[in-house]
Amino acid sequence: MGWRTVLISGRAKLDLKLNNLVIRKEEIVKIHIPEIAVLIIDSTMVSFTTALIEKLIAEKVKIIFCGKDHNTIGEIVNYYNKHNSPLMIRKQISWENNAKQKVCQEITKEKINRQAKLLEFIGNENANLLQEYKSQVQVGDVTNREGHAAKVYFNSLFGKNFSRSQDNPTNAMLNFGYSILLSIFTREITSSGYLTQLGIFHENQFNYYNLSSDLMEPLRPMIDNIVYFYEPEKFEKEEKIAILKIMDEEVFVGKTRYTLLNAVNEYCKSVFLALEKGEEQLIKFIDYEL
């Protein structure tokens, strides 16, 4: 799989030549397709050939489209990702409920842990409160520690008047970052032969990416960290580039250093193994420096 993220903005024509993505603008740029992990189309003035799309899909390149407001509006999902996908889906359906609940508990605890570490990093005293919430997470999160932690966390980062429902550059940048994470996880899940629709916690019948939403939770603070220090006053190309730099981040799984894409692969494999064996301690979470 590739590792590069390519962002296309403005007027452009894209086509295929000798296994290269050819970008025709004022100048012509060629990028070797096997190097590409994600292609983001951030313009309604981009045209491309079906031969290119076919090749990108075959190489498992995630193609994401943005609307006029520069927010992501959709992506292309490959129908056929792994030769034994029917077997993997049967395994997915047979994951025991107890195993799913225990895995969800660990994911929720790790998400709150990462939120607490970010608050500690910026010197916010509410980091200790979030660590308390983490220790109180029960199976099924029946006391909604995740929700309580989120309220304290976002108010600590962006102010007491901040709400995730507001239409502002901060939320736009957060949403874009989360959508990139979602696409990374969707790419990994489908490449492993599983269905993104069948979540282990998220069960929204209208959400095509329930499982992706479940697994990405501990990495959301990576995006929050970028947005907090960027303090966006607008949401345009520069802000997107700042978010996309996470693709080049070096992170850790255990003591081994990985790029983010490879780390997501290791993390997802460990979650699937934990679900299959019913042993939540097998999960290998991603660690990263702030």
Short names for language-model regions:
Residues E35-N84:
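Glycine/small-residue-rich interface belts in oligomeric ring/scaffold proteins
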Residues I8-T50, E54-K55:
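N-terminal ordered "arm"
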Residues G2-A12, E26, A58, H70-L290:
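Active-site helix-to-loop segments that bind/position phosphate- or nucleotide-bearing substrates
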